């Protein structure tokens, strides 16, 4: 089992089914590992659903440009107020408009 780190950062999330967004919100990361992220949620989310996350990242590109960690994955555990997402794919992006980051 990978090490989990207690990292608290702002996160925007979307639950998607096909091209349809059925839930969206914002919260905080609770802990992160190389394969999973646990976040707070405003609603109870369904286990097994596809999810996209955009996490405000503390490091800056060239000391001047703020970054986001964008993650696609699946909800592997869900409880009222939080969810765990298995990381399927991730990439770092420069911060833009919230919805623009989540759109792709």
Regions found by a protein language model. Give the residues of each.
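Structured alpha-helical
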Residues: 1-104
